[in-house]
Amino acid sequence: PTITNDGVSIAKEIELEDPYEKIGAELVKEVAKKTDDVAGDGTTTATVLAQALVREGLRNVAAGANPLGLKRGIEKAVEKVTETLLKSAKEVETKDQIAATAAISAGDQSIGDLIAEAMDKVGNEGVITVEESNTFGLQLELTEGMRFDKG
């Protein structure tokens, strides 16, 4: 068995029989996947928020609320939250800040340090690929120019 706390990995494994529950599960899977595609992190938070929005939305509709009014309210709230987050966001600029941020995301300081080293070498416009290996330990490989693995 795989042990994980990653929202997108958990969401992918959800399979339900009830058609209505299945629709909700697919919605949560899509939220987790989009979050992973755009940000690469925060999938668990996005999954929990999506579940809360669905639960409370259905509760309000059952109590007589207008679904379109709820949708408009959620959209306004998203705008405000996005605005507030962008105001409080801080640039991650130094190698130490990059290492700390990467370590939190990876849950491992040595991986954070290696990612910071890779970022230092390739710059903000470079591409970093993380791959699993059959060997033990961490390794940084720098390829200048372009590399084609196949064909």
Curated annotation (Swiss-Prot):
Keyword terms: ATP-binding, Chaperone, Cytoplasm, Isomerase, Nucleotide-binding, Stress response
Binding site for ATP: D41, G42, T43, T44, T45
Domain of life, per lineage: Bacteria
One cellular-component annotation, GO: cytoplasm
Record keyword Nucleus present: no
UniProt catalytic activity: ATP + H2O + a folded polypeptide = ADP + phosphate + an unfolded polypeptide
Main location: cytoplasm
Molecular function GO terms recorded: ATP binding; ATP-dependent protein folding chaperone; isomerase activity
Pfam family, one: Cpn60_TCP1
InterPro entries tied to this protein: Chaperone_TCP-1, Cpn60/GroEL, Cpn60/GroEL/TCP-1, GROEL-like_equatorial_sf, TCP-1-like_intermed_sf
Enzyme type, top EC level: isomerase
Any one GO biological process: protein refolding
Recorded consequence of changing K121N: In strain: TMH16
Catalytic activity, EC: 5.6.1.7
UniProt keyword Cytoplasm, yes or no: yes
Assembly: Forms a cylinder of 14 subunits composed of two heptameric rings stacked back-to-back. Interacts with the co-chaperonin GroES.
Family membership noted in the UniProt record: Belongs to the chaperonin (HSP60) family.
Record's function text: Together with its co-chaperonin GroES, plays an essential role in assisting protein folding. The GroEL-GroES system forms a nano-cage that allows encapsulation of the non-native substrate proteins and provides a physical environment optimized to promote and accelerate protein folding.
PANTHER family: 60 KDA HEAT SHOCK PROTEIN, MITOCHONDRIAL
Protein name (database record): Chaperonin GroEL
Organism per entry: Mycobacterium avium
Top-level taxonomy: Bacteria, Bacillati, Actinomycetota, Actinomycetes, Mycobacteriales
Gene behind the chain: groEL
